[in-house]
């Protein structure tokens, strides 16, 4: 239920950002009169809709409720980890909102793509806060994925083979595996970006021998 409440609230927030984007693009000239502000809205819209609407509702809400039901299991394999998975999301959203409040916001697009996310374009802590927000959301996703995979593999009714599982359970299972493979790679990319911004490394800076396209591949 908490997942649903959180997801609905985030969905309303995301929808209001969506309306702002549509209003800006739906008529000639500008409505916001500020390109940076528009970019911040687009970035926040992407993050909120993915990490705070789709994942909490589709996976957190429906997944946690339907998967054990369809397996004949009393609960998820790790209920407390499930709880922790949820409670990482509110601080993550708080960090994302604070990233839009400090300096002029993180106007990088939702991929946080360098060089737009470098110190030259965003000198203050806004991009760093957005990266920390992504880290927390990613940890939450990984915990959830481990929980789902363990539940589906180990907590089925006796005689319920994998090929007899409902397609919804299969879809959650495959999504969780893909998430477990991809989320650490994304975490690596944004951590490298974080060190590029704060510790003078040059992972993505060609002037220091880095590869400007590497981030794109990792993402």
Curated annotation (Swiss-Prot):
<keyword id="KW-0479">Metal-binding</keyword>
<dbReference type="GO" id="GO:0015990">
    <property type="term" value="P:electron transport coupled proton transport"/>
</dbReference>
<comment type="function">
    <text>Component of the cytochrome c oxidase, the last enzyme in the mitochondrial electron transport chain which drives oxidative phosphorylation. The respiratory chain contains 3 multisubunit complexes succinate dehydrogenase (complex II, CII), ubiquinol-cytochrome c oxidoreductase (cytochrome b-c1 complex, complex III, CIII) and cytochrome c oxidase (complex IV, CIV), that cooperate to transfer electrons derived from NADH and succinate to molecular oxygen, creating an electrochemical gradient over the inner membrane that drives transmembrane transport and the ATP synthase.</text>
</comment>
<keyword id="KW-0679">Respiratory chain</keyword>
<keyword id="KW-0496">Mitochondrion</keyword>
<feature type="topological domain" description="Mitochondrial intermembrane">
    <location>
        <begin position="188"/>
        <end position="219"/>
    </location>
</feature>
<comment type="subunit">
    <text>Component of the cytochrome c oxidase (complex IV, CIV), a multisubunit enzyme composed of a catalytic core of 3 subunits and several supernumerary subunits. The complex exists as a monomer or a dimer and forms supercomplexes (SCs) in the inner mitochondrial membrane with ubiquinol-cytochrome c oxidoreductase (cytochrome b-c1 complex, complex III, CIII).</text>
</comment>
<dbReference type="GO" id="GO:0046872">
    <property type="term" value="F:metal ion binding"/>
</dbReference>
<keyword id="KW-0186">Copper</keyword>
<keyword id="KW-1278">Translocase</keyword>
<keyword id="KW-0106">Calcium</keyword>
<keyword id="KW-0472">Membrane</keyword>
<keyword id="KW-0813">Transport</keyword>
<keyword id="KW-0812">Transmembrane</keyword>
<keyword id="KW-0349">Heme</keyword>
<keyword id="KW-0249">Electron transport</keyword>
<comment type="pathway">
    <text>Energy metabolism; oxidative phosphorylation.</text>
</comment>
<feature type="transmembrane region" description="Helical; Name=1">
    <location>
        <begin position="2"/>
        <end position="22"/>
    </location>
</feature>
<feature type="topological domain" description="Mitochondrial matrix">
    <location>
        <position position="1"/>
    </location>
</feature>
<feature type="binding site">
    <location>
        <position position="29"/>
    </location>
    <ligand>
        <name>Ca(2+)</name>
    </ligand>
</feature>
<dbReference type="InterPro" id="IPR023616">
    <property type="entry name" value="Cyt_c_oxase-like_su1_dom"/>
</dbReference>
<dbReference type="InterPro" id="IPR000883">
    <property type="entry name" value="Cyt_C_Oxase_1"/>
</dbReference>
<feature type="transmembrane region" description="Helical; Name=2">
    <location>
        <begin position="47"/>
        <end position="67"/>
    </location>
</feature>
<feature type="topological domain" description="Mitochondrial intermembrane">
    <location>
        <begin position="107"/>
        <end position="128"/>
    </location>
</feature>
<feature type="topological domain" description="Mitochondrial intermembrane">
    <location>
        <begin position="23"/>
        <end position="46"/>
    </location>
</feature>
<feature type="topological domain" description="Mitochondrial matrix">
    <location>
        <begin position="150"/>
        <end position="166"/>
    </location>
</feature>
<feature type="binding site">
    <location>
        <position position="24"/>
    </location>
    <ligand>
        <name>Ca(2+)</name>
    </ligand>
</feature>
<feature type="binding site" description="axial binding residue">
    <location>
        <position position="45"/>
    </location>
    <ligand>
        <name>Fe(II)-heme a</name>
    </ligand>
</feature>
<dbReference type="GO" id="GO:0005743">
    <property type="term" value="C:mitochondrial inner membrane"/>
</dbReference>
<feature type="topological domain" description="Mitochondrial matrix">
    <location>
        <begin position="68"/>
        <end position="85"/>
    </location>
</feature>
<keyword id="KW-0408">Iron</keyword>
<comment type="similarity">
    <text>Belongs to the heme-copper respiratory oxidase family.</text>
</comment>
<dbReference type="Pfam" id="PF00115">
    <property type="entry name" value="COX1"/>
</dbReference>
<feature type="transmembrane region" description="Helical; Name=3">
    <location>
        <begin position="86"/>
        <end position="106"/>
    </location>
</feature>
<dbReference type="GO" id="GO:0004129">
    <property type="term" value="F:cytochrome-c oxidase activity"/>
</dbReference>
<dbReference type="GO" id="GO:0020037">
    <property type="term" value="F:heme binding"/>
</dbReference>
<dbReference type="GO" id="GO:0006123">
    <property type="term" value="P:mitochondrial electron transport, cytochrome c to oxygen"/>
</dbReference>
<protein>
    <recommendedName>
        <fullName>Cytochrome c oxidase subunit 1</fullName>
        <ecNumber>7.1.1.9</ecNumber>
    </recommendedName>
</protein>
<feature type="transmembrane region" description="Helical; Name=5">
    <location>
        <begin position="167"/>
        <end position="187"/>
    </location>
</feature>
<dbReference type="InterPro" id="IPR036927">
    <property type="entry name" value="Cyt_c_oxase-like_su1_sf"/>
</dbReference>
<keyword id="KW-0999">Mitochondrion inner membrane</keyword>
<feature type="transmembrane region" description="Helical; Name=4">
    <location>
        <begin position="129"/>
        <end position="149"/>
    </location>
</feature>
């Amino acid at each position: 239920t908490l997942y649903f409440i959180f997801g609905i609230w985030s969905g309303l927030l995301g929808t209001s950002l969506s309306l702002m984007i549509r209003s800006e693009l739906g008529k000639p000239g500008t409505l916001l009169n500020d390109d940076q502000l528009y970019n911040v809205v687009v970035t926040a819209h992407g993050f909120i809709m993915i990490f705070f609407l789709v994942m909490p509702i589709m996976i957190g809400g429906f997944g946690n409720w339907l998967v054990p039901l369809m397996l004949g299991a009393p609960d998820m394999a790790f209920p407390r980890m499930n709880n922790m998975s949820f409670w990482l999301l509110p601080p993550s959203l708080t960090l994302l909102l604070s990233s839009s409040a400090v300096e002029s916001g993180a106007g990088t697009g939702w991929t946080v793509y360098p060089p737009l996310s470098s110190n030259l374009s965003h000198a203050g802590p806004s991009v760093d806060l957005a990266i920390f927000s992504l880290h927390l959301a990613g940890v939450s996703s990984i915990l959830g994925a481990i929980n789902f995979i363990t539940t589906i593999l180990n907590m089925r009714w006796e005689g319920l083979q994998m090929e007899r599982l409902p397609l919804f359970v299969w879809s959650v299972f495959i999504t969780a595996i893909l998430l477990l493979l991809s989320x650490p790679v994304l975490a690596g990319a944004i951590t490298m970006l974080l060190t590029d911004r704060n510790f003078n490394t040059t992972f993505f800076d060609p002037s220091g021998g880095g590869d400007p396209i590497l981030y794109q591949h990792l993402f």
